[in-house]
Amino acid sequence: DGFGYVKFDYNETLGLGVDGAESPGEGLRQVILATNELYAGLAKVLPNTVIELCASGGHRLEPSLMRHGHMGSFSDAHETPELPLIAAGLHRLVPVRQLQVWAVLRVEADERRLLYVLAAGFLGRMCLSGDLPALSEEQWSLAKRALELYAKAAPVLRDGRTHWFGPAVKAWRHPEGWQLIVRVAADEQTALVVGHAFGGVLPEVAECELPGGPWVVEEMLAETATAAGATTGGSASPLPGAGAGANGAATLTETAAFTLVGGRRLVWGVPGAFSAAVVLLRRA
């Protein structure tokens, strides 16, 4: 057959409903049943084919449909600042091991912007897109380091449990505040924390009480001193480059990093608007 991967990209709204049944709702139910039968039949004919379900509208990210898909992505071209908010929110609907999150890397992006989208990839199954062939050596160095850390964190994402911390974000299209997403492995021996700061008036630090523990830092991904000092607050533009250029330092000094207090309280020094950091923890 020659096929190893198939993507069903469905980005339509429901409109006024579905014709041909007693009601629009019944018509929709029949359409969903037929779609489920299609996916189930495909799995029988091509049992080794990986199936991705893509639905920016969201109505294909539904449990009865997701059981037929190996992966589901809410968008393959999401470059707006609400990316980490949507990805974290979908932990309530889609198993994280199935939740595809696209990190779109642009050649004009500075270190802060690259970290923002790469960190969002740690909220699901990270997929890279964008200007990959044109990235500089420094940009690829950061991306490779993120991928290496992601490989270590994969078991936590696959079988863990998610905890949300941070103030309520009232407008996702123009987000203000911050979020810390804590994912604890099933055996409670490792944990992954993904921090994102948005716009508005930001605190100097964001912190949370970690479940379980005590914990120690295994590895982290954060900004260099140069990038961390570039923007200390306010509402810097998050799109798409957000900075002066792509030629940042290849080696991270991680000044805008996480600190553990007493092994259970995690403190993140927020470097500025639309920034991010990731840390992998292990039990002490």
Each language-model region and where it sits:
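Intrinsically disordered, low-complexity terminal tails and inter-domain linkers enriched
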Residues: 224-251
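Catalytic cores of secreted or luminal carbohydrate-active enzymes
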Residues: 118-163
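C-terminal beta-strand-rich structural cap/linker in extracellular carbohydrate-active enzymes
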Residues: 257-284
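Solvent-exposed beta-hairpin/edge-strand motifs
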Residues: 211-225
